[in-house]
Amino acid sequence: MSIPFEVISATLALSIGSFMNVLDSTIVNVSLTHIAGDFAVAPTQGTWVITSYAVSEAIFLPLIGWLTKRFGIVRQYTLATLFFTGASVLCGISFSFGFLLFARVLQGVVGASMIPLSQTLMLSFYPKEKKAMALGIWSMTIVLAPVLGPVIGGWITDSFSWRWCFYINVPFGILSTYIVHSIFRKKGYKDKIEKVPVDKWGLIFLAIGISALQIMLDKGNDLDWFQSPFIISLALIAFIFLTILVIWEWYHPTPVVNVKLFLNKNFSIGALSITIASIAFFASVVVIPLWLQNYMGYTALDSGIATSTLGLSILFTAPILGSILNNLDARKVVVFGFVLFSITAILTGNYPPDITVSYIAGSRFLTGIGLGIFFIPLNTITLSDIPPEELTGASGLYNFTRNIGNSFGTPLAINYWNNRISIHHQDIVSAINVGNPNFQSYINHFSSPLHMKLEMINELITQQSALMGVNDIIIGSGIMILLLIPLIFLARRPIVK
């Protein structure tokens, strides 16, 4: 059966929108030093460019179901994409660091609904036997974007300016908005709008709780976690207000966040699984480029290219899996993906000191195959038992849990990596026998002063410790994914509707 041109056009437009949105969460990661330098702020302050976007998006993701009831799905998506494009322009023309942060907050607020709504709209174009394929295409853009973000950002920053990391959104945002609006208007689509009352207290509890949680996650590593009174305060605020939010929304007749979705067995299993899987996946995505840049002498662009093969394998895996998923038990496919991801991580998590670019690229490619296999059917399992009228809200909440996993994964991975570096460094130093003839021969081989020889040896030990720490991260991520397998078997088998 051939696919109509308007379906292909809508798929392309919606994929561009979701890709552009997710891309902006990582594209500036490699440009922070340039941004901080341009505005004469400390490098540590530069990270607020990431935090401000993440916090505002995290607050509004759970609100998607409520927002679409008030404004309609198509109108909400097109306005969100258009405003996101405008906010990108504001980021690019920023004349001060404060204005840039304001523009990034605006990006997160208006763009939060783009991801779940692009999924909902894309699925609406396909018949039931093709929905899995549509989901495969959509999932591909979501997983590819954070992997390719540093590569694209590094190239743009090196070749042009960090400001073009934002300007690049303009033509794609306008194109996505125009195509989606035109196609749905041509189809005579009418948005269903309900005058849902505003749950003001729910909004307040959500904003305070999520803001505190996201800032705690983003700044915890920099402030030594719970050694900092600021982080402790944020943790308490997040716990108190999110607990109040759950209780309040549970009994509210028109909640901004439908927390009762977690009573759905498949949704709860899927949300928990994607949170943990995102932590495991993002750990290596963050740490490997840092290791390549800080210890192996790679540039940001080179490290991004070396690891981008993970996205390349997803590019091939997702559409193929999507086309055959309806004929398979999604639970078994997820488990197969988990096993493949874990085996690949455990077997390749033994990087040698003389590692080559091809070895890194090959190992990330194999890992990406497992990731691509489990990501799509896990989405299918999660949303399989959700009523149509709650699907958009459930998609927003599911994507929120994925974002939380990413947010947890980054600081946890960096903190764990630093701890493993310290442990391995101590172990290697304690194992050195200064009286060993081989050690003495190595020392005497150089004519430098003794203190320079010791500094050089310490640098070699640190480099080896960092490598061993990376291997620990990769193997640990594989083990985390394996532990999710029993949870998947508790889910009901999704039925194609």
For each predicted feature, which ranges?
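Hydrophobic transmembrane architecture of multi-pass small-molecule transporters
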Residues: 403-490
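Helix-loop-helix hairpins in multi-pass membrane proteins, especially solute transporters
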Residues: 61-202
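C-terminal membrane-cytosol helix-exit motif in multi-pass small-molecule transporters
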Residues: 171-189, 207-219, 237-251, 485-492
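Transmembrane core module of solute transporters
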Residues: 5-69, 74-80, 88, 98-100, ...
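Small-residue-rich alpha-helical segments with characteristic i,i+4
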Residues: 147-148, 360-439
